[in-house]
């Protein structure tokens, strides 16, 4: 009877509560297990590491999607992740659940090689006040410097003229256009950041692009994936500096440019470029330890803009010229539209884009078919979410497969073929498709998308206005084989640029 009264009742109540909680937890685990996305059975310790090709994750993801469906799970050692495929599921994750999928997981190789504890940047920064402050600053600064206005457009138009002059210097001889395209796009970025451009033969520009390519090569492939999976290896003395040597050297070049910019900065004058604007914000934020405007973050933001803004656009342009020599009928039709709208002498302007539906469709199809960034940067859930009927717990790493959207067979008429008509209606008017998302979507969509669109249209149209491109005599038609890295690049090829 003592158990039912006084102190004796307390242990019984505690035992009952604990039992109820344990039973509830068991049921919750069973529910999650039954509704958690399916996937290959993980091995002890290794998870699914031996069941995927870390050098070609896109292919592995495609094969697993065919077997498990649009939403499936992987376990990389002890790290759980869910792959999201197809337009419907990707939009659900990035747009419908945008507030809860905007954060980034920790990426050990970036944290170990950080430019400092306050160097968050924009691309890989955690979702929070600092990220919002820097994204807002970047967007507003680009707008103030002329994005969507004539000033920035004139910079790009002038650079397109320099690029065409460099193509003309090839005198119709075979050459690989990628190097010149890299230089032109890099000059647009340096104009935005430092309000300066380099001559194409400038040793500093050549070295900067070489180191940028090396840095991007360093962070892609098998070794970085292993180091991210087993970060304890990063503490092996000298390993990081050996594997990622290009990153540190590239950062040193950027530091030199920042030092020169700071030396010539006049705070009384309007900002010449993004660095001036950032320095002005640093002055305003003095004494505020919570501000994200500091020297370390300036370095990181500039590195982010170089990496995100240079190689992606130049790689897309390289694919565009490859497709023009592979599909000469498309090239001729683009040139006919250019001649009809611009004539032989007037340089293209962004205002012309609305009157050039076929050219616009071709540029969009280049981006869709080239598919240069098949797997999006990882994000992490900040709460439990339900996607396509599957329950995904808080703290799960998600990777959205943008390639599965750009090649979604339920959306595109000819997903595996180069077909500009994907973006034209029956009357020949341009139509943007919902499944066109090479810049991602949602809160983490690429902030440089408007600039990239401007560069693609002005560079591509200017080149097709002034040159006809062809396969060099005696050479086979180039293949569309890819070189895998951070981005999908075309295998090296040559073309002839004959002045029109």
Swiss-Prot record:
Q: Which GO terms describe its molecular function?
A: heme binding; iron ion binding; oxidoreductase activity, acting on paired donors, with incorporation or reduction of molecular oxygen, reduced flavin or flavoprotein as one donor, and incorporation of one atom of oxygen
Sequence positions that bind heme: 446
The organism named in the record is Mesocricetus auratus (Golden hamster)
Matching entries from InterPro entries are given as: Cyt_P450 (IPR001128), Cyt_P450_CS (IPR017972), Cyt_P450_E_grp-I (IPR002401), Cyt_P450_E_grp-I_CYP2D-like (IPR008069), Cyt_P450_sf (IPR036396), Cytochrome_P450_fam2 (IPR050182)
The entry's keywords: Endoplasmic reticulum, Heme, Iron, Membrane, Metal-binding, Microsome, Monooxygenase, Oxidoreductase
Q: What class of enzyme is it?
A: oxidoreductase
A GO cellular component annotation here is:
endoplasmic reticulum membrane
| Cofactors that this protein relies on | heme
> What is the protein's membrane topology class?
Peripheral membrane protein
- Family the UniProt entry places it in: Belongs to the cytochrome P450 family.
Where in or outside the cell it occurs: the entry states: Endoplasmic reticulum membrane; Microsome membrane
Q: Which domain of life is it from?
A: Eukaryota
Q: Which Gene3D superfamilies match?
A: Cytochrome P450
**Protein's name according to its UniProt entry:** Cytochrome P450 2D28
Q: Which GO terms describe its biological process?
A: arachidonate metabolic process; xenobiotic metabolic process
Its Enzyme Commission number(s) read 1.14.14.-
